[in-house]
Amino acid sequence: MFRLRLVEQPMPTGSKDTQVLLEWLIDSLSLVRRKPESWNTNDEPSALHRMFTGSLLKEPLRGWNTKELGDCCGLSQTAMHNQMLRLRESGLVSSELKGRWHIHVLRGGSMANAVELLGVQARKILDIRLTELSDLIIDSEERMYTDSEDEERRFKIKIAEPSATIDGKDRIDSLMEDLGLNGERGKSEDDLAKRITIELSQSHRPITLLVLAERLNETRSRVQRVIERLLEMSIIERVAMPDRIAQDVYLCLMRQFDARGEEWLVTRGGLGRLDTNITKKIISGIKKKNLSIDRVQGILEDVEIENQKLLLNTLGGRMPYGFRIAGKNGDEIRERVLNRLDRTIRRLITVAKRIDDSLEV
């Protein structure tokens, strides 16, 4: 069964070193479980690296059995079985049974061909899975009223073809598991990722982390871990919540007026940066004790959103942020995620071609 875990990484710009390029490819395909930043060019190559350079890259279509591959990299047959299973699932290597040995070849006869084949499979399978996800997402123009933050995270996704439905579960549970949203050590009875995905998919407005935790009766840290995975997959995005600014500004104004007084509000509190009439209305409302959230919202209506953010910040508050599905419907999400996948696959193909070229020198 096809299973692939992709991690987008900066290109090894200009490098023609086979070792550097191959380790970059191995890390991008998550074939070795380690932190990419923990490896540098002075470290000893991984066992998988030694296996590729000692066999499959030298003679990709010769047909190598597991014992020969193990001899190249110094791994036991059990360890090699696990490595080859992962390579077959990722689509880099194909195998056939000859006699009592499984014979392995690099697909397509070169690293570039193998990665291109892998990319075609990955895109089609992800398209199928995103179509399943699209069925959960309700159409909503309102959801996208506010511009998203200009932040792009490193793309990280698990792609797996549809697996069998788990006993006592439904297809959504299988989808969450196959996309890796339950985490690597998720328990079978844990459906938090499913509940969060459904909650966001059915919402017309961004939802804060705190609100999600309260609605689902879960700890904030557990909810945050699932949110991080959804962000890395580009399914959701973080967005400012301007409709909450008036509420937070009001609370900060009242707190700071009681603690520091009018002069501080006008000077260091930021009211002095606003139009004089706006400042007077706010101060007057505080003194007369008739200021409310609705009045603050009306007073700040003509103030640019960036200046509202600045005011909240100088008053000691923080801009409220929430999370939303990153599109008005399922089709937009599908296109968004596939575009990120296409970019990652293009990088993989470019590096794979460089690996092939470096071997010819």
Segments the model singles out, each with a brief description of its role:
Residues 113-160, 260-361:
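Amphipathic alpha-helical dimerization/coiled-coil segments
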Residues 85-89, 97, 107-112, 116-117, ...:
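DNA-contacting interfaces and partner/effector-binding or oligomerization modules
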